[in-house]
Design a protein with these regions (language model features):
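Intrinsically disordered, low-complexity acidic regions
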Residues: 196-215, 223-293
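Extended serine/threonine-enriched, polar tracts that run as long, contiguous segments within proteins
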Residues: 148-237
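OB-fold ssDNA-binding interfaces and closely related basic DNA-contact patches used
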Residues: 2-178, 240-283
Length: 293
């Protein structure tokens, strides 16, 4: 049983990983509810788990937007909605369509454009936010690993890919060096909440962890793999976008539109686009099925 299970897990071919990266760059519900969180200023040793059998990648992208929502107390809070194109397989996403239409209507209004797509520190703009999910855990001497969701930013993804895509003279690495059940290398990851740019510090530092100046592996035990096998594949961790997500996005957009005096929801042409976006989810029973026991 154990040997059969081990044989199903494999590291990802670099050629496949590069294709996924190119696809991610083009666009530039967790089963165990546990997340791996980095600690400010601490170098954490991290072991990434492999893709489940049948999965193409050990990580998946997440794309979302921050919007404004009114809670039960009447207070306005910021929250996220997923992107329907990536997470629902649709042709249109409501927030993306809103941004395109707003640019068409207010493109020459610098103040409006700053509110819509500005990148200031306290900006509430509608720029998409990207992150990636994989299964991983912190390596601690003598302790068993338990796969957790590690959500990381593009800078970390790029640093991981830089390590994976490195070449040894004339012989390129053909599989990723992180996820093999026996030979997966341990990472050293440091998060700096307030990096000292003058000293060359970055928000994230990612390298192979080393012993005697050499990268080292941390094999996964049969018990660790059996426990991991019971978790959802990473591609199923982010729920599929449906009608309820659309309704949440519509609510958040209307609040944002009112806060920023864009008044697009008084525009019949924009409301026609809203109806076209909504039609993508009508007749889809996915949301209803999720309610069934």
């Amino acid at each position: 049983m154990a040997n059969s299970l081990r044989s199903q897990y494999r590291a990802i071919k670099i050629s496949s990983l590069k294709k996924a990266v190119d696809k991610d760059d083009a666009m530039v519900g967790v089963s165990n509810n546990e997340y791996l969180n980095l600690e400010d200023g601490k170098v954490m040793k991290i072991r990434i788990f492999p893709a489940h059998p049948g999965e193409e990648q050990f990580y998946v992208p997440r794309k979302c937007y921050w919007l404004s929502f009114v809670n039960s107390d009447g207070d306005v809070k910021r929250g996220t909605v997923l992107d329907s194109i990536l997470h629902g397989g649709t042709k249109m996403d409501l927030v993306n369509e809103y941004v395109k239409y707003a640019k068409k209507k207010y493109g020459k209004d610098a103040e409006k454009m700053e509110a819509l797509t500005g990148t200031g520190l306290n900006s509430n703009a509608l720029n998409p936010q990207y992150s990636w999910f994989c299964y991983a855990d912190e390596v601690k001497e003598g302790e068993e690993l338990h796969a957790k969701i590690w959500e990381f930013k593009k800078m970390v993804r790029d640093l991981l890919n830089k390590l994976a895509f490195s070449e040894d003279d004339d012989e390129p690495i053909e599989v990723d060096p992180f996820t093999d059940v026996d030979d997966g290398l341990v990472l050293a990851v440091k998060y700096n909440k307030k990096p000292n740019k003058k000293k060359g510090e970055q928000y994230y530092e990612v390298d192979f962890a080393k012993k005697s100046k050499q990268p080292y592996s941390r094999p996964l035990s049969d018990d660790e793999l059996e426990s991991f096998a019971n978790l959802k594949p990473i591609s199923e961790v982010i729920p599929k976008y449906g009608m309820r997500d659309y309704e949440r996005a519509l609510d958040g957009l209307q609040n944002w539109d009112e806060e920023n005096d864009f008044n697009l929801f008084d525009d019949d042409e924009w409301l026609d686009i809203v109806e076209k976006v909504k039609a993508q989810y009508e007749g889809n029973d996915d949301d209803d099925e999720e309610e069934k026991p």
